[in-house]
Regions:
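Formylglycine-dependent sulfatase
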Residues: 1-139
């Protein structure tokens, strides 16, 4: 594995599905305050020309994580699982020597219905092994 050198930047990617960019003060909204996002953006590279062609949770997340269309990943609805053959942004950063973390909602491994009887000890949104798509840490 490659080692990330001391000059490699920290990378934080926010994946807010179903959030319109213009709903943030960063992009012109004046009725909402998001001071933490604003501070983070002020000291960051902000991508201003990105799009999700499928505004549904699981397909949008799969597209953002893999860079592939929903019809290619098989995520056309919310109740699907990610194939082990998919390469994600987590895999790519891990191969480059980064430690990777996923914090928040996953929603890419639910199957038809979450196993409600197993929550919260083994929630389906924190899968094991390859189903984590390259992310080391989960919260």
């Amino acid at each position: 594995m490659n080692q990330v050198n001391k000059t490699s930047p920290n990378v934080v990617v926010l994946f807010p599905d179903q959030l319109r960019a213009l709903s943030l003060p960063l992009f012109g909204e004046q009725q909402i305050e998001t001071p933490n996002i604003d501070r983070l953006a002020a000291d960051s590279l902000v991508l201003e020309n990105a799009i999700s062609n499928c505004p549904v949770c699981t397909p949008a997340r799969a597209m953002l994580l893999t860079g592939r269309y929903p019809q290619t990943t098989g995520h056309l609805i919310n109740t699907t699982r990610t194939r082990h053959s998919e390469i994600s942004i987590g895999d790519t950063f891990a191969r480059a020597g980064y430690k990777t973390a996923w914090v928040g909602k996953w929603h890419l491994h639910t199957g038809l219905w979450p196993a409600l009887d197993r929550m919260p000890q083994h929630p389906d949104w924190v899968p094991e092994g390859r189903d984590r798509l390259g992310f080391d840490y989960w919260r």
